[in-house]
Amino acid sequence: MVVCFLWLLLPYAATTLSASVPGCVPSGALLPRPTELSQSQNIKDATERLSRSLDDAVSGRIKAGWDIANTSFSVSIVSPNGGDPRTGVLWEYHHLAEKNINGTKHLDGDSQYLIGSVSKIFSDLLLLKSDVDLQDPITKYLPQLKNASSPIDWDNISLLSLSEHLSGIPANTIGALQFYFLEPLYRALGFPPLNKTDYPPCGIADLNKGCTPEELLTELVNSHPVSEPYERPVYSQLSFTLFSLALANDTGKDYAQMLEEQVIRPLNLRNTGVSPGEDKRAVIPNVEQQGWGADYGYNAPGGGLYSSLNDLSTLVTKILDYSILQNPQATKKWLQPRSATSSLNTLVGQPWEILRTSGMTPKYPHMIDIYGKSGGAPGYISQINVIDQYGVGVVLSTAGPLDSRAAYIINEAVLSAILPAVEDEARKQAGMYVGEYTSQKVDNEDATDYAPIKLKTVIDNGTGIKLESLSRNDSDILEGIRKVWSATLSTVGQLASEMRVYPTGLERLATNDKSLVEQDWRINFDLIPNFNEQASDLPGLGKLEALCTSWQTVDWLYYAGVPMDRIVFIVDKEAGRVVGVEIPFLRSGIIQKLN
């Protein structure tokens, strides 16, 4: 017990005497994911406004911010909770630019785009579905990299680190982003003159042929690391080439075959594969340098796939319903950060680009984690966003000029439209938990043993569901919890004046009636911050941000073996209503909800 207690106190010793700022809420869903989104008026209103805005932009009635005549795009909002049964699409919008004279003449959800580094999602998925041990060193599968004189300790580079951008190896394959035709420019800029033999023997545009896999591995032995493994995230295309070559050596199958068997066929994807795709279905930008039809070779795992809006929507939907891997827990593990950047708002996953933002729901501001992946190929930009908290996603592909900002503008516009709407819908549907619950005396219960329990819940402008009051035999139980905390854990800090409950995602059948489920919720023990600068005259105080510690106080208070923060709602899923609540630490049994 002492060890656990010190574990909680140590962060305070290192930072402040305080705990978290009021409102230090749990991560993840703050209310249950809303369902039947296709029937939601909030969603309908938001997407209708969004469609009108995009109509105005592509027609020139408002400033779009990109070359309308030369930029085609497809965008969708998806969810497993009410979206199309196959793709999950709730809403979609397509624009075929008038100058896109090649490729498809009918742009729809099955039209093909290059998706650039969104390919990394497919490759990481392939790795996660494989039978290899992700802790294995890359040299187990690519022994050519074993070389004592190599600046990189390849024996220390695991498959897992490669998939998480944490290996510290070079960003690109041999010759990538090296352009021999720029030699005159380099000299004019003062760079030293070089001979052709100074360049790598393969992979240099306009100088020599592309590297074979064997030549690539030979040259990599001489490459220098960018950092130590796990020192910091370093974005790497090369990493995906290497672990895909490792999988190919392990299975005896090439990347395209593995992708077909493990990802494309199981997900029933109809317009996804290794470039090149089908010209007649392609969205081909009318620009001089565009990548449609290119053969990406061993670079395909990091950025050489094509796909369609429907296929990417299916991918995101299967991630959101947790069915894309062997079990829901594996998918939830995938949707976790692996490292941090210097920005408080940017984390790195496998291979997710995670944006943490609190400005997308201005009426009810709170932190939202957007698990995104962007991708670019010459003339193409794609973006997928997975918002697990709400069970929704956004998919976007564009084809146009190399300097187009269309993807960035449209992506933000769509997120700004859908997230407030789905927040409103989540609050509306969570209204079924709101109300008054009162216990009833059972027929055979002695009158002297009966102690009425009353609970009142509300939804206000804060997060989760607020416990307005909880009493037993007219005793204020919420105040009682605060006093118990103060008596036993006051060193940690004092509980905030409000108590709110949040869903845990745990539910089970309540009875043999399959429509009734028990949903576990937990009270968030949020703490009032103490400010060092108010307690001491020592210099330098008040500069450290308060530490968010409510995640450390879950499941702490117990009453005779039962957690005091656990509340169980009894939900009739077929009827869409809450029929009662159980407060286990009060030994309440089921307390009926008053109509």
Curated annotation (Swiss-Prot):
EC number of this enzyme: 3.5.2.6
Subcellular location field: Secreted
PROSITE patterns in alphabetical order: BETA_LACTAMASE_A (PS00146)
Signal sequence bounds: 1-18
Glycan attachment points: 70, 102, 147, 156, 195, 249, 461, 473
InterPro entries: Beta-lactam-related, Beta-lactam/transpept-like, Beta-lactamase-like_AB/R
Keyword Glycoprotein: yes
Gene3D superfamilies on file: DD-peptidase/beta-lactamase superfamily
Chief localisation class: secreted
Annotated keywords: Glycoprotein, Hydrolase, Secreted, Signal
Keyword Acyltransferase: no
Cellular component GO terms, alphabetical: extracellular region
One Pfam family here: Beta-lactamase
UniProt-listed SUPFAM superfamilies: beta-lactamase/transpeptidase-like
Name of the protein described by the UniProt record: Beta-lactamase-like protein ARB_00930
